[in-house]
Amino acid sequence: MIIKNMSFKVGQTMIICGVAKPDATNFAVNIGPDEQDITLHINVRFDAHGDENTVVCNSYEGGNWCGEVREGGFPFQQGESFKITIEFTPAEFLVTLSDGSTIHFANRMGAEKYSVTSFDGEARIQSIEIK
């Protein structure tokens, strides 16, 4: 699912609620300036890419993945609902997971607004709120 022209700006918070599929291996949330580049990639990995029960954040720019960040807990369960909160400050994205654990991820592209949000993988997104 791709959502275009939905502005996410510095000072705002995005709240994503969904349900991981019962047999999910992974799913991802992507925020960026366009469909090619991703300033914040949140990849929830139950069993994918050689990782188990890990959240990996990264960015994708100019056709290349950058350095991975692995912080926070893993409050996700296959077949269960989840909530991901993303606070957008000038310097970083503060990602808060359902259990209250946090991931600090730099705003590597430095923009004050991103307009494309997409979701990949094995989760059903129920709501997206920006406030």
Question: What role is predicted for each listed range?
Answer:
Residues 1-2, 118-131:
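C-terminal helix/juxtamembrane-tail motif
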Residues 1-58:
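Secretory/extracellular carbohydrate-interaction modules
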Residues 7-9, 77-79, 88, 110:
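Surface-exposed coil/turn segments at beta-strand junctions on protein surfaces, enriched
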Residues 16, 84-103:
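Carbohydrate-binding surfaces in secreted/extracellular proteins
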Residues 23-25, 36-39, 92-94, 102-105, ...:
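Eukaryotic short linear interaction motifs
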Residues 53-63, 119-124:
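Short, surface-exposed secondary-structure junctions/capping segments
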Residues 64-83:
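Short, aromatic/His-centered strand-loop micro-motif at the edge of beta-sheets
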Residues 99-114:
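Short, solvent-exposed beta-strand-to-loop segments that form ligand-recognition rims
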